[in-house]
Amino acid sequence: MKNLFSIEGKIAIVTGGSRGIGEMIAAGFLANGAKVYISSRKTEACEATAERLVEEYGGECVSLPADVSRLEGITALVSAVAERESQLDILV
């Protein structure tokens, strides 16, 4: 039963992951063994948050800045993840 809800080894994208609730969700995923991609419109904030989360929780957190309120941003984010991963397990 313990492994039923495990996210260890899962691949997650957290949009709005550079601050607030998104950052907290990303931190929780990292702390529980997921590989996390965070996205936000502000490149510097996204990169700084990814670095800080890795320092604090370990694991792998990748910054993929994108404006997902625009179709171009969504397309860019999907392409960036598809280049790196063969699957996606969690989308927030």
Describe each PLM feature range.
Residues 1-13:
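Flexible N-terminal pre-Rossmann segment of NAD(P)-dependent oxidoreductases
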Residues 56-60, 80-91:
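A glycine-rich helix->loop->beta "capping" turn
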Residues 43-44, 65-77:
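The beta1-alpha1 cofactor-binding region of Rossmann-like NAD(H)/NADP(H)-dependent oxidoreductases
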Residues 11, 18-20:
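Conserved glycine-rich cofactor-binding loop
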